[in-house]
Protein backbone atom coordinates (compact mmCIF):
# COMPACT_ATOMS: atom_id res chain seq x y z
CA UNK A 1 0.00 0.00 0.00
CA UNK A 2 1.33 3.43 -0.97
CA UNK A 3 1.22 5.64 2.11
CA UNK A 4 4.04 8.05 1.40
CA UNK A 5 4.00 11.81 0.89
CA UNK A 6 0.53 12.43 2.23
CA UNK A 7 -0.97 14.18 5.22
CA UNK A 8 -4.26 13.15 6.83
CA UNK A 9 -6.12 15.38 9.27
CA UNK A 10 -8.58 13.86 11.72
CA UNK A 11 -10.96 14.97 14.42
CA UNK A 12 -12.24 13.28 17.57
CA UNK A 13 -15.99 13.82 17.43
CA UNK A 14 -17.63 15.67 20.34
CA UNK A 15 -14.26 16.60 21.84
CA UNK A 16 -11.94 19.63 21.50
CA UNK A 17 -9.16 17.39 20.13
CA UNK A 18 -7.84 17.19 16.58
CA UNK A 19 -4.85 15.55 14.95
CA UNK A 20 -2.91 14.82 11.80
CA UNK A 21 -0.64 12.08 10.46
CA UNK A 22 2.08 12.58 7.86
CA UNK A 23 4.24 10.23 5.80
CA UNK A 24 7.24 11.50 3.80
CA UNK A 25 9.10 9.34 1.30
CA UNK A 26 9.91 10.90 -2.09
CA UNK A 27 9.91 14.44 -0.68
CA UNK A 28 12.36 13.37 2.03
CA UNK A 29 14.60 11.57 -0.46
CA UNK A 30 14.65 14.57 -2.79
CA UNK A 31 15.71 16.79 0.10
CA UNK A 32 18.65 14.48 0.76
CA UNK A 33 19.78 13.62 -2.76
CA UNK A 34 22.26 16.49 -3.14
CA UNK A 35 23.74 16.16 0.35
CA UNK A 36 25.85 13.58 2.15
CA UNK A 37 24.28 13.92 5.60
CA UNK A 38 25.35 11.58 8.43
CA UNK A 39 22.65 9.14 9.54
CA UNK A 40 21.96 10.96 12.81
CA UNK A 41 21.50 14.22 10.89
CA UNK A 42 19.20 12.56 8.35
CA UNK A 43 17.04 11.40 11.24
CA UNK A 44 16.85 14.86 12.82
CA UNK A 45 16.10 16.51 9.48
CA UNK A 46 13.40 13.95 8.66
CA UNK A 47 11.72 14.51 12.00
CA UNK A 48 11.78 18.29 11.53
CA UNK A 49 10.30 17.89 8.04
CA UNK A 50 7.47 15.75 9.40
CA UNK A 51 6.89 18.28 12.18
CA UNK A 52 6.75 21.20 9.74
CA UNK A 53 4.08 19.50 7.64
CA UNK A 54 2.04 18.66 10.74
CA UNK A 55 2.19 22.24 12.01
CA UNK A 56 1.58 23.80 8.59
CA UNK A 57 -1.64 21.79 8.36
CA UNK A 58 -2.92 23.35 11.60
CA UNK A 59 -2.07 26.95 10.66
CA UNK A 60 -3.93 29.30 8.35
CA UNK A 61 -1.00 30.23 6.12
CA UNK A 62 -3.17 31.42 3.18
CA UNK A 63 -0.48 31.20 0.53
CA UNK A 64 2.41 31.73 2.92
CA UNK A 65 5.03 29.41 4.36
CA UNK A 66 6.13 28.02 7.70
CA UNK A 67 9.87 27.91 8.37
CA UNK A 68 11.31 25.90 11.27
CA UNK A 69 14.96 26.30 12.26
CA UNK A 70 17.16 24.72 14.89
CA UNK A 71 20.23 26.93 15.29
CA UNK A 72 22.89 25.04 17.21
CA UNK A 73 26.04 26.07 19.02
CA UNK A 74 27.56 22.60 18.88
CA UNK A 75 28.57 20.49 15.86
CA UNK A 76 25.05 20.90 14.44
CA UNK A 77 24.96 24.47 13.18
CA UNK A 78 21.59 24.59 11.44
CA UNK A 79 18.52 22.56 10.58
CA UNK A 80 15.99 24.39 8.45
CA UNK A 81 12.74 23.24 6.86
CA UNK A 82 10.26 25.30 4.86
CA UNK A 83 6.70 24.10 4.24
CA UNK A 84 4.25 26.12 2.16
CA UNK A 85 0.50 26.36 2.61
CA UNK A 86 -0.02 23.78 -0.15
CA UNK A 87 2.48 21.42 1.53
CA UNK A 88 5.45 22.01 -0.73
CA UNK A 89 8.49 21.21 1.40
CA UNK A 90 12.26 21.66 1.30
CA UNK A 91 15.02 21.23 3.87
CA UNK A 92 18.74 21.49 4.47
CA UNK A 93 21.31 21.34 7.27
CA UNK A 94 24.80 22.53 8.15
CA UNK A 95 27.22 20.88 10.54
CA UNK A 96 30.90 20.47 11.31
CA UNK A 97 32.90 17.57 12.70
CA UNK A 98 31.77 14.11 13.76
CA UNK A 99 28.18 13.58 14.83
CA UNK A 100 28.00 9.80 15.20
CA UNK A 101 27.12 8.66 18.70
CA UNK A 102 26.06 12.12 19.86
CA UNK A 103 22.69 12.84 21.40
CA UNK A 104 20.51 15.54 19.88
CA UNK A 105 21.15 17.79 22.91
CA UNK A 106 24.92 17.40 22.49
CA UNK A 107 24.73 18.20 18.78
CA UNK A 108 22.75 21.40 19.34
CA UNK A 109 24.43 22.47 22.59
CA UNK A 110 22.28 25.30 23.99
CA UNK A 111 21.02 26.48 20.64
CA UNK A 112 17.81 28.22 19.64
CA UNK A 113 14.60 27.18 17.95
CA UNK A 114 13.13 29.65 15.46
CA UNK A 115 9.66 29.51 13.91
CA UNK A 116 8.72 31.93 11.14
CA UNK A 117 5.33 32.45 9.52
CA UNK A 118 5.96 34.21 6.22
CA UNK A 119 2.72 35.49 4.62
CA UNK A 120 4.42 35.93 1.22
CA UNK A 121 1.99 38.73 0.41
CA UNK A 122 4.09 41.69 1.42
CA UNK A 123 2.92 41.50 5.01
CA UNK A 124 5.20 41.38 8.03
CA UNK A 125 6.44 37.87 8.87
CA UNK A 126 5.87 36.58 12.40
CA UNK A 127 8.90 35.10 14.12
CA UNK A 128 9.33 33.40 17.48
CA UNK A 129 12.73 32.53 18.97
CA UNK A 130 13.16 30.40 22.07
CA UNK A 131 16.03 28.43 23.63
CA UNK A 132 16.16 24.77 22.65
CA UNK A 133 14.45 22.87 25.45
CA UNK A 134 14.21 19.10 25.23
CA UNK A 135 16.23 16.22 23.92
CA UNK A 136 14.37 15.74 20.63
CA UNK A 137 12.64 17.62 17.83
CA UNK A 138 9.24 16.63 19.24
CA UNK A 139 10.08 17.91 22.73
CA UNK A 140 11.36 21.22 21.35
CA UNK A 141 8.16 21.84 19.41
CA UNK A 142 5.89 20.74 22.23
CA UNK A 143 7.66 23.11 24.60
CA UNK A 144 7.38 25.98 22.11
CA UNK A 145 3.66 25.42 21.49
CA UNK A 146 2.91 25.24 25.20
CA UNK A 147 5.00 28.24 26.26
CA UNK A 148 4.63 30.58 23.30
CA UNK A 149 1.24 29.69 21.84
CA UNK A 150 -0.44 28.28 24.99
CA UNK A 151 -1.83 25.39 22.95
CA UNK A 152 -1.67 21.84 24.31
CA UNK A 153 0.13 19.92 21.58
CA UNK A 154 1.77 16.50 21.50
CA UNK A 155 3.86 15.16 18.68
CA UNK A 156 5.35 11.77 17.80
CA UNK A 157 8.04 11.72 15.10
CA UNK A 158 10.04 8.95 13.45
CA UNK A 159 12.68 8.69 10.73
CA UNK A 160 14.81 5.73 9.65
CA UNK A 161 17.05 7.74 7.32
CA UNK A 162 14.97 6.81 4.26
CA UNK A 163 11.45 7.78 5.32
CA UNK A 164 9.95 10.12 7.86
CA UNK A 165 6.56 10.13 9.57
CA UNK A 166 4.77 11.84 12.39
CA UNK A 167 1.55 12.32 14.28
CA UNK A 168 0.24 15.44 16.00
CA UNK A 169 -2.57 15.62 18.54
CA UNK A 170 -3.73 19.06 19.61
CA UNK A 171 -6.32 20.51 21.93
CA UNK A 172 -8.19 23.13 19.94
CA UNK A 173 -8.14 26.56 21.58
CA UNK A 174 -11.41 28.12 22.73
CA UNK A 175 -13.29 24.83 22.37
CA UNK A 176 -15.40 23.64 25.34
CA UNK A 177 -14.65 20.19 26.71
CA UNK A 178 -17.58 19.89 29.11
CA UNK A 179 -19.15 17.08 27.06
CA UNK A 180 -16.05 14.91 27.49
CA UNK A 181 -13.68 16.46 30.06
CA UNK A 182 -11.40 13.39 30.09
CA UNK A 183 -10.96 13.30 26.31
CA UNK A 184 -7.54 14.98 26.13
CA UNK A 185 -5.87 12.83 28.78
CA UNK A 186 -7.46 9.64 27.43
CA UNK A 187 -6.44 10.32 23.83
CA UNK A 188 -2.87 11.21 24.79
CA UNK A 189 -2.58 8.03 26.84
CA UNK A 190 -3.65 6.01 23.80
CA UNK A 191 -1.39 7.94 21.41
CA UNK A 192 1.61 7.41 23.68
CA UNK A 193 1.51 3.68 22.87
CA UNK A 194 2.56 4.31 19.25
CA UNK A 195 5.91 2.87 18.14
CA UNK A 196 8.29 4.34 15.58
CA UNK A 197 7.84 1.40 13.20
CA UNK A 198 4.07 1.87 13.33
CA UNK A 199 4.38 5.54 12.40
CA UNK A 200 6.59 4.62 9.45
CA UNK A 201 4.81 1.47 8.22
CA UNK A 202 1.09 1.86 8.93
CA UNK A 203 -1.29 3.93 6.81
CA UNK A 204 -3.23 6.69 8.53
CA UNK A 205 -6.37 4.55 8.54
CA UNK A 206 -4.56 1.57 10.06
CA UNK A 207 -2.75 3.71 12.61
CA UNK A 208 -5.93 5.43 13.80
CA UNK A 209 -7.65 2.06 14.05
CA UNK A 210 -4.74 0.64 16.04
CA UNK A 211 -4.51 3.57 18.47
CA UNK A 212 -8.04 4.92 18.74
CA UNK A 213 -10.30 1.96 17.98
CA UNK A 214 -12.77 2.88 20.72
CA UNK A 215 -12.92 6.57 19.80
CA UNK A 216 -15.24 8.25 17.31
CA UNK A 217 -12.76 9.62 14.77
CA UNK A 218 -13.54 11.55 11.59
CA UNK A 219 -10.77 11.22 9.00
CA UNK A 220 -10.52 13.90 6.32
CA UNK A 221 -9.34 13.51 2.74
CA UNK A 222 -5.60 13.10 2.34
CA UNK A 223 -3.46 16.02 1.19
CA UNK A 224 -0.44 15.35 -1.06
CA UNK A 225 3.01 16.58 -0.05
CA UNK A 226 5.77 17.31 -2.53
CA UNK A 227 9.35 18.51 -2.55
CA UNK A 228 9.38 22.10 -3.77
CA UNK A 229 12.24 24.58 -3.95
CA UNK A 230 11.26 28.11 -4.87
CA UNK A 231 14.73 29.34 -5.77
CA UNK A 232 15.17 31.08 -9.12
CA UNK A 233 17.65 33.21 -11.01
CA UNK A 234 15.36 36.16 -10.41
CA UNK A 235 15.40 35.72 -6.63
CA UNK A 236 19.18 35.31 -6.60
CA UNK A 237 19.48 38.46 -8.70
CA UNK A 238 17.35 40.36 -6.21
CA UNK A 239 19.63 39.14 -3.42
CA UNK A 240 22.67 40.48 -5.29
CA UNK A 241 20.92 43.82 -5.77
CA UNK A 242 20.53 44.03 -2.01
CA UNK A 243 24.31 43.67 -1.66
CA UNK A 244 24.71 46.81 -3.73
CA UNK A 245 26.33 47.58 -7.06
CA UNK A 246 29.71 48.50 -5.56
CA UNK A 247 30.09 45.27 -3.57
CA UNK A 248 29.00 43.13 -6.52
CA UNK A 249 31.56 44.93 -8.71
CA UNK A 250 34.30 44.28 -6.13
CA UNK A 251 33.46 40.55 -6.08
CA UNK A 252 33.52 40.37 -9.88
CA UNK A 253 36.84 42.22 -10.03
CA UNK A 254 38.33 39.54 -7.80
CA UNK A 255 36.53 36.41 -9.04
CA UNK A 256 35.30 37.40 -12.55
CA UNK A 257 32.02 35.51 -11.91
CA UNK A 258 29.67 35.15 -8.97
CA UNK A 259 28.70 31.52 -8.46
CA UNK A 260 25.84 30.70 -6.09
CA UNK A 261 24.48 27.27 -5.18
CA UNK A 262 21.07 26.77 -3.60
CA UNK A 263 21.48 25.01 -0.25
CA UNK A 264 18.14 23.25 -0.71
CA UNK A 265 18.19 21.84 -4.26
CA UNK A 266 21.82 22.47 -5.29
CA UNK A 267 20.81 24.52 -8.33
CA UNK A 268 23.70 26.63 -9.66
CA UNK A 269 23.46 30.27 -10.66
CA UNK A 270 26.28 32.17 -12.38
CA UNK A 271 26.55 35.93 -12.88
CA UNK A 272 29.27 37.70 -14.90
CA UNK A 273 29.90 41.40 -15.54
CA UNK A 274 27.23 41.59 -18.25
CA UNK A 275 24.69 39.97 -15.94
CA UNK A 276 25.61 42.38 -13.14
CA UNK A 277 25.18 45.39 -15.40
CA UNK A 278 21.69 44.18 -16.29
CA UNK A 279 20.87 43.63 -12.62
CA UNK A 280 21.41 47.25 -11.75
CA UNK A 281 19.66 48.71 -14.79
CA UNK A 282 16.40 46.76 -14.42
CA UNK A 283 13.60 46.83 -11.90
CA UNK A 284 13.61 44.71 -8.77
CA UNK A 285 10.80 42.16 -8.63
CA UNK A 286 9.76 41.23 -5.11
CA UNK A 287 8.04 37.82 -4.75
CA UNK A 288 4.33 38.20 -4.14
CA UNK A 289 4.34 41.95 -4.84
CA UNK A 290 4.07 44.36 -7.72
CA UNK A 291 7.25 45.63 -9.34
CA UNK A 292 9.17 48.04 -7.15
CA UNK A 293 11.71 50.61 -8.33
Swiss-Prot record:
Membrane-traversing stretches: none
UniProt-listed InterPro entries: Heat_shock_Hsp33, Heat_shock_Hsp33_C, Heat_shock_Hsp33_N, Hsp33_helix_hairpin_bin_dom_sf
Any one GO CC term of the record: cytoplasm
Family: Belongs to the HSP33 family.
Keyword field contains DNA-binding: no
Compartments in which it is found: Cytoplasm
PANTHER family tied to this protein: 33 KDA CHAPERONIN
GO biological process terms held by the UniProt record: protein refolding
Name recorded for this polypeptide: 33 kDa chaperonin
GO terms of molecular function: protein folding chaperone; unfolded protein binding
SUPFAM superfamilies to which the protein is assigned, alphabetical: Hsp33 domain (SSF64397), HSP33 redox switch-like (SSF118352)
Keyword Chaperone: yes
Keyword terms of this UniProt record: Chaperone, Cytoplasm, Disulfide bond, Redox-active center, Zinc
Role played: Redox regulated molecular chaperone. Protects both thermally unfolding and oxidatively damaged proteins from irreversible aggregation. Plays an important role in the bacterial defense system toward oxidative stress.
Chief location of this protein within or outside the cell: cytoplasm
PTM info: Under oxidizing conditions two disulfide bonds are formed involving the reactive cysteines. Under reducing conditions zinc is bound to the reactive cysteines and the protein is inactive.
Pfam families: HSP33
Cystines in this chain: 229-231, 262-265
Amino acid sequence: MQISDHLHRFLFENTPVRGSIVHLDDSFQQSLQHHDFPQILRQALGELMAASALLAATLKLKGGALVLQVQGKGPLKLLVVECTSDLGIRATAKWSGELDGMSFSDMVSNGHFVITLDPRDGGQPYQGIVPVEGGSIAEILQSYMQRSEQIDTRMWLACDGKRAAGMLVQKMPDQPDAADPDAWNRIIMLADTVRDEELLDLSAVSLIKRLFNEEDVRLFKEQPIKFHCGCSRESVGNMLRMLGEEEVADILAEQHTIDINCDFCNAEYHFDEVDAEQLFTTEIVMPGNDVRH
